[in-house]
């Protein structure tokens, strides 16, 4: 059952001054502990091409929220700016911060078919990259400080470069594995939602979320061997056709009257 989480107002800045886009209601299909709704304030940052965003900005347990508005100004704005299916609007939240970095949190609003959605940017992987870079700089600084006149500078530089290459290789490998798993989850979710729509099952129907979850879990279990190989870095992506066949089989089983 959908529940209203909060209302978002954000400011546009331009040559003609500031314009506030108001009354953007964020709704979630997932159960939440809090029953109260809040108001978020934000600032428009820029437009982005969703196809060019790295997959890690959307975590595996990320919530996608439905957006609604009764404001004619907001409706006209989104209709004008989100004509391109791959376009997103980046909003910096004024009164919400990322729990890990204590930096501002960001939302990306986008259109999927006729629906307006948004998600919060996941900065976890970015912080890991930043941490690796900081660590490398510290190691290089220590190496330079320990060089003596009698020491071999060539050997020290070579060792430093080898450590950098090894660290970069490990980071790239982890990113590649994470991208494959995120792609699997994203494709699986879209196939399930599409299959439910084709069967005339809307999210207003009782047990909609339960049907979605058991189908998702069952599909993951079906492809557990491939996912295990992916997590070890030795597996290929699960093909779209294979995943589509799995979802169709499961939905036929679970929706059989």
From Swiss-Prot:
Record keywords, A-Z: Cell cycle, Cytoplasm, Cytoskeleton, DNA replication, Nucleus
Single GO cellular component term: cytoplasm
Keyword RNA-binding: no
Major localization listed first in the record, in broad terms: nucleus
Compartments where found: Nucleus; Cytoplasm, Cytoskeleton, Spindle pole
The family this protein is said to belong to: Belongs to the SLD7 family.
Protein name, as recorded: Mitochondrial morphogenesis protein SLD7
């Amino acid at each position: 059952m959908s529940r209203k989480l909060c209302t978002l107002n954000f400011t546009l800045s331009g040559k003609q001054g500031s314009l506030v886009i108001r009354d953007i209601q964020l709704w979630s299909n997932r159960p939440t502990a809090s029953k109260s709704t809040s108001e978020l304030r934000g600032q428009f940052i820029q437009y982005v091409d969703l196809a060019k965003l790295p997959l890690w900005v959307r975590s595996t347990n990320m919530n996608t929220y439905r957006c609604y508005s009764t404001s004619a100004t907001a409706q006209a704005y989104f209709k004008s700016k989100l004509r391109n299916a791959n376009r997103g609007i980046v909003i910096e939240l004024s009164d919400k911060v990322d729990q890990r970095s204590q930096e501002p949190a960001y939302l990306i609003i986008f259109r999927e078919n006729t629906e307006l959605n948004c998600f919060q940017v996941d900065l976890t992987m970015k912080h890991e990259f930043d941490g690796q870079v900081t660590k490398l700089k510290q190691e290089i600084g220590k190496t330079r400080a320990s060089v003596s006149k009698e020491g071999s500078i060539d050997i020290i530089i070579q060792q430093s470069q080898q450590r950098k290459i090894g660290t970069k290789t490990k980071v790239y490998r982890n990113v590649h594995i994470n991208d494959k798993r995120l792609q699997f989850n994203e494709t699986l979710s879209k196939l399930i939602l599409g299959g439910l729509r084709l069967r005339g099952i809307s999210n207003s129907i009782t047990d909609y979320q339960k049907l979605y979850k058991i189908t998702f879990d069952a599909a993951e279990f079906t492809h557990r061997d491939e996912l295990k190989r992916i997590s070890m870095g030795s597996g290929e992506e699960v093909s779209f056709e294979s995943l589509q066949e799995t979802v169709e089989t499961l939905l036929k089983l679970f929706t059989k009257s």
